[in-house]
Amino acid sequence: MLTSEQIMGLLPHRYPFALVDRVVLHEPGQRAVAIKNVTLNEPQFQGHFPGRPLMPGVLIVEAMAQVGGLIVAQMPDLPKGLFVFAGIDAVRFRRPVVPGDQLTISCELLSLKRQRFGKVRGEARVEGQLVCSGELMFSLVD
């Protein structure tokens, strides 16, 4: 388990793009499971959509990417730097995510090449139901 201070020490994201509230499992270089509490106070709900707020799919994918970032953030052999999106594959959205939901995000490292390019498989669930899944690629920016 990681505290919020530890999460902030590992990820560069800050409000309003810090999308990991709590880490319940962290195995550097292998996998991580984290929680994102979805609240009506988040800025995206002002316009997505008035009267029927839905969490934008791109933010669910970003939350999965941040959990993936936690997997590589403490790997001792990797150079320090900023890992950014390099691509996404086979992302599917299964059901809407609304304020009041709690996303449980699981990611596992699939590959890491030349200490610069990697791929993770991610899933986001609400109350055990799959809401989003896909593969996310990242690369190290010097």
Curated annotation (Swiss-Prot):
The keyword Chloroplast does not apply. Pfam families: FabA. The keyword Cell division does not apply. GO terms for cellular component: cytoplasm; membrane. InterPro entries: FabA_FabZ, FabZ, HotDog_dom_sf. It catalyses: a (3R)-hydroxyacyl-[ACP] = a (2E)-enoyl-[ACP] + H2O. Its main location: cytoplasm. One of its GO terms (molecular function) is (3R)-hydroxyacyl-[acyl-carrier-protein] dehydratase activity. GO terms for biological process: fatty acid biosynthetic process; lipid A biosynthetic process. It is found in: Cytoplasm. Its EC number is 4.2.1.59. The active site is at H48. Keywords: Cytoplasm, Lipid A biosynthesis, Lipid biosynthesis, Lipid metabolism, Lyase. Gene3D superfamilies: Hotdog Thioesterase. Belongs to the thioester dehydratase family. FabZ subfamily. PANTHER family: 3-HYDROXYACYL-[ACYL-CARRIER-PROTEIN] DEHYDRATASE. HAMAP family: FabZ. Involved in unsaturated fatty acids biosynthesis. Catalyzes the dehydration of short chain beta-hydroxyacyl-ACPs and long chain saturated and unsaturated beta-hydroxyacyl-ACPs. This is 3-hydroxyacyl-[acyl-carrier-protein] dehydratase FabZ. It comes from Prochlorococcus marinus (strain MIT 9313).
